[in-house]
Regions:
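Long, structured stretches of catalytic cores involved in phosphate-ester chemistry, encompassing
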Residues: 1-173
């Protein structure tokens, strides 16, 4: 599940990829064939390992080039604005609920979220500065030019919801 493969791919190819993953990785297969899971180390650490590809919506394709070197996504032009669309997901509803519940109920001191994506934005140019917002209050929040890559940037609404959940539930560490 990489190089542009997502939940809209050929079902047989996706099933074959999942089967190959389970055959190659030293993990126990559960009845749901899910690859997201948690690993505990006593009462000290719980690592929540995410599957950011199997359930994801298609990535937002690049629509710009930055400095002639990098493919980029300009959020002011199609299809870049899709990055902010409500409901876009990389986790899927069941996994997101599992993650929220796991964060809320674990008794581990340290909670680690393992994601194959960078959680931090890869923003090259910021269009949401105080100066620009003063000129145009209707600017897209977090608008800008982002590096085009497999990242949480393509799923900003879901990332925002997850971060708000962590904050509102006072999830520490």
């Amino acid at each position: 599940f990489y190089n542009g493969v997502d939940s809209t791919g050929d079902p047989q190819r996706l099933a074959n990829a999942r089967q190959a993953w389970f055959e190659a990785m030293p993990v126990k297969r559960d009845t749901d064939d899910r690859t997201y899971r948690s690993i505990r180390w006593g009462n000290l650490t719980e690592m929540l390992l995410l599957d950011t590809r199997q359930y994801r919506d298609p990535e937002v394709p690049a629509n710009a080039t930055f400095a002639g070197l990098l493919d980029a996504q300009d959020t002011t032009a199609p299809p870049g604005e899709q990055m902010f669309a409500p409901g876009r997901t990389t986790l899927g509803e069941a996994q997101l609920q599992w993650l929220k519940e796991s964060l809320a109920t674990t008794r581990a001191k340290w909670k680690i979220i393992g994601s194959s994506y960078d959680m931090a934005p890869w923003k090259l140019v910021d269009f949401d500065t105080p100066e620009l917002r003063a000129e145009n209050p209707d600017l897209q929040k977090n608008g800008g030019i982002y590096v085009s890559n497999e990242a949480w940037d393509d799923y900003q609404d879901e990332r925002r919801k997850l971060m708000r959940h962590i904050e509102s539930e006072n999830v520490s560490n």
